[in-house]
Amino acid sequence: MQRELVSFPLSPTVRVKLVAAGFQTAEDVLGVKPSELSKEVGISKEEALETLQIVRRESLTDKPRCAGASVAGKKYTALELLEQEHTQGFIITFCSALDNILGGGIPLMKTTEVCGVPGVGKTQLCMQLAVDVQIPECFGGVAGEAVFIDTEGSFMVDRVVTLANACIQHLHLIAGTHKDEEHQKALEGFTLENILSHIYYFRCHDYTELLAQVYLLPDFLSNHSKVQLVIIDGIALPFRHDLDDLSLRTRLLNGLAQQMISLANNHRLAVILTNQMTTKIDKNQALLVPALGESWGHAATIRLIFHWEQKQRFATLYKSPSQKESTIPFQITPQGFRDAAVTASSSQTEGSSNLRKRSREPEEGC
């Protein structure tokens, strides 16, 4: 199994530059001369030589030192995997229809991609989940914390405050109905201040900053073990506007996807990636498809596509290893992400939407 460069005891600066240049594993650099590595990565020849020496030495001993590095060769039986699936947690969305088609909510230990045009509700879902992941276990939550990586500047703390207050009020109503001591005690710590204190926000302005933050996450998570959700809101923007080299972009995206899968598995957390839609011309027809190409479509375990039909928002479960394709309506209210009002035209449909053939919808909302 190839060992990733992020697991070597290199300086953070060199580590980030290696990743940004497209070097992912030890095998990628071991055949490169110091002068070539220096030129391609943008480091001094001395740093390049030291890097190669460290990689060679560590490759011989093959003892990963990085927190969160996976242990090669660990095996599971099919029964253990089945039990793991049954015991994994879910982060509820407060839209029961969406939770149902996902099998219970956003699953832990998996990567979920949410695609859609601007204004359809991707960031709203991310902010909702950053609050919902903190719901106490006695209320059906996972009692975790959230990391929010923002590449587009769409995060609105005032909106998070509104969502958090609505969630607190909802749980108080439930506790009032049950009148259970456990519920009352759990709510003592579920305050607005605590909710905001456990959303860790990072603003990344380009792909270098994004890659740096992603590859430093294992160290951060080792010091914040309660994190159960990592969000990258706007995966496409840094790579669509800052990179002209398509082969380099593909390598960087593949490395980022593998890192997020590793984080989800090793730290038993959920990963949310939001992606924009782009126009594809097919047989003289303009179609909306997820950005970053077809190869990126295999990166996430689950793919949701949000879209408009007239003035109604819909979510289509387009890809899932365990659930069938389904489409449901939803709405975004002042209180947050919620079920749509039930009408004859907005009842749940299953397997009815092929998003690859969907023509451009109006980009409404904000």
Curated annotation (Swiss-Prot):
Residues 343-354 have a biased composition (Polar residues). The keyword rRNA-binding does not apply. PROSITE patterns: RECA_2 (PS50162). It is found in: Nucleus; Cytoplasm; Cytoplasm, Perinuclear region; Mitochondrion. This is DNA repair protein RAD51 homolog 3. A motif (Nuclear localization signal) lies at residues 356-360. Residues 1-117 are annotated as: Required for Holliday junction resolution activity. The modification Phosphoserine is found at S11. Transmembrane segments: none annotated. ATP binds at G116, V117, P118, G119, V120, G121, K122, T123. Residues 70-127 are annotated as: Interaction with RAD51B, RAD51D and XRCC3. GO terms for cellular component: cell junction; cytoplasm; cytosol; mitochondrion; nucleoplasm; nucleus; perinuclear region of cytoplasm; Rad51B-Rad51C-Rad51D-XRCC2 complex. Keywords: ATP-binding, Cytoplasm, DNA damage, DNA recombination, DNA repair, DNA-binding, Mitochondrion, Nucleotide-binding, Nucleus, Phosphoprotein. CDD domains: Rad51C. Pfam families: Rad51. It comes from Cricetulus griseus (Chinese hamster). InterPro entries: DNA_recomb/repair_Rad51_C, DNA_recomb/repair_RecA-like, HR_Repair_Mediator, P-loop_NTPase, RecA_ATP-bd. It comes from the Eukaryota. Belongs to the RecA family. RAD51 subfamily. Part of the RAD51 paralog protein complexes BCDX2 and CX3; the complexes have a ring-like structure arranged into a flat disc around a central channel. The BCDX2 complex consits of RAD51B, RAD51C, RAD51D and XRCC2; the CX3 complex consists of RAD51C and XRCC3. The BCDX2 subcomplex RAD51B:RAD51C interacts with RAD51. Interacts with SWSAP1; involved in homologous recombination repair. Interacts directly with PALB2 which may serve as a scaffold for a HR complex containing PALB2, BRCA2, RAD51C, RAD51 and XRCC3. Interacts with HELQ. One of its GO terms (molecular function) is crossover junction DNA endonuclease activity. Gene3D superfamilies: P-loop containing nucleotide triphosphate hydrolases. One of its GO terms (biological process) is meiotic DNA recombinase assembly. Essential for the homologous recombination (HR) pathway of DNA repair. Involved in the homologous recombination repair (HRR) pathway of double-stranded DNA breaks arising during DNA replication or induced by DNA-damaging agents. Part of the RAD51 paralog protein complexes BCDX2 and CX3 which act at different stages of the BRCA1-BRCA2-dependent HR pathway. Residues 338-366 are annotated as: Disordered.
